[in-house]
Amino acid sequence: VALRDHPLCADIPWDGVEFWWSDERFLPTGDPERNDTGAFEGLLNHYPIPAQNIHQMPSSGGAATLDHGAVDYWTQITAEFGDDIAFDVCLLGVGEDAHVASLFPSSEAVRVSTPRVLAISDSPKPPPERLTFTRPLIEQSRQVWLLASGAAKADAVHCIMTMSDEVAAPASNVRGSLRTVLFLDDDAAALIEPDEDTSYPADEEYLSSEYS
C-alpha cells in the first residue's frame, strides 16, 4: 500500500514494466493465499499496466498438474528472454527460517544448481504445493532486494549477515549480478552489531529504517 500510494508511482511508464513472480502457492486464481492476489489488490489494479505485461504463475485451476505448471512458466520465461534471462529487480521476502521464494532450509530445492522453475510438493510451510525459481534463476537478476520486517525476522537477518550457507539459510547466499540490498525495519535489524564480523559482502548493503 505504501508503494501504491507513493506520489512517484503516477509518473512511472507502466507500459514498459513487466511483472514476473519468483514463487507462488499452487492454489486457484484469486485465492487470498496466492502472492499475485495481494499484488493485484495492493498495486497492479491501481495503475494502467497492460495485461500482457503481467506474467502470473499458473494456478491449480489453470494448469493440468503442478509439474505442468512449472514447465509452462519456464517456457514463458525462455520465450520472453531466450538464452539471455535477465530480470532487472527481484524482490524477495525473507522468512523467519531465512527462506526466500519457496526455497526452504535443507530442502532439495536449495541444492538445485541450474536456473529453472521447480514444482514443490512438500513445502514445510502450507500450502505444500508451490512453484518457485531456483537460486541460480533468482541470481539472473541485476538487483536482488531482500525485505524483512518485525522482531520475528531478527534471527534470520542475523544469519544472513553472519553466514553464507545456501542450504541452511537460503537467504544468506542469494545475490544480484550487480547489486544486493537488504531492506529492514529496526526490529528486524535488532541483532546486527555495527562492529560485528559478518560474511555479507562489503560491496553489498543493508538499509535499516522504519517503513510501513
Where on the chain are the PLM-derived regions?
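Class I SAM-dependent methyltransferase SAM-binding "motif I" and its flanking Rossmann-like core
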Residues: 90-136
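Ligand-binding beta-strand-loop-alpha-helix segment within the catalytic cores
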Residues: 10-88, 202-205, 210-211
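Short, conserved loop/helix-junction motifs that constitute active-site signature segments
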Residues: 9-18, 47-49, 109-111, 136-141, ...
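Short acidic/glycine-rich loop or secondary-structure boundary segments that cap or lie
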Residues: 28-30, 64-65, 97-104, 110-112, ...
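A glycine- and small-aliphatic-rich helix-loop capping segment at beta-alpha/alpha-beta transitions
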Residues: 2-13, 37-41, 105-114
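ATP/nucleoside-binding phosphotransfer catalytic cores, i.e., glycine-rich phosphate-binding loops
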Residues: 136, 142-212
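Short beta-strand segments
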Residues: 21, 57-58, 90-94, 146-149, ...
